[in-house]
């Protein structure tokens, strides 16, 4: 049994690399299994400890995650590393449980319209699915952590603005269903710092001793500012992807997740120790360039370097 407090210690910021899952949803060419393993091991060498490694979805539709079981084994072999995988239905949950992954993530849409369009089910059915996931977790041998992400929590691609009270109600229902914590997702990058701070603060208060995760996209260039607001509001788990990999099928042209290396720099600059070596982290981008040629990578640090000097391998590779 994995204890939440052991994986996400109180008072410490935990940064999760979601590039191996969320970052690969829309790419035209995805890394080989060996490439993913090098990516993860090199980030681990830089100090990263939390990895969203893939999804338990049909390989015929999502071939980029066909090797998820192998990647789960890879992260499990790294001392102190923590693997997370997405599962959206009972079949996926059972496969995730069989894999031994340490944490299972699932999703509930903030709006009825998006829930029907994206998952072909109502929000009530989505909550019932969360409850069933928790029941299966409780009946399993290793009892992984379960988190529920509220997608479109800060703006919906279909309805536009989202009532924060509706999001808070869904968070409450997910906690009642048995999840270990919730993640607030600005799926299409609609929000600004004020909105992120206010919603995060409300959810931190209602979550009590349970941590709160904030998952942000940089669609309109507000990702880092929003992450800063989330930290100020009490969130202690943040998601990002190396090079800002990712995107959203509901936001054409979106630049993807918050750049992971810039997120590390933000946390360190605000006084939150991450244990991550930024120069080593930036150097891992070379693997992505090799495995996914033509894929655009973003990032202020990779472009400009650290304030006290260049970022090493990344800047040399860019000028070569």
PLM region spans:
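Catalytic cores and adjacent flexible loops of soluble metabolic enzymes
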Residues: 1-320
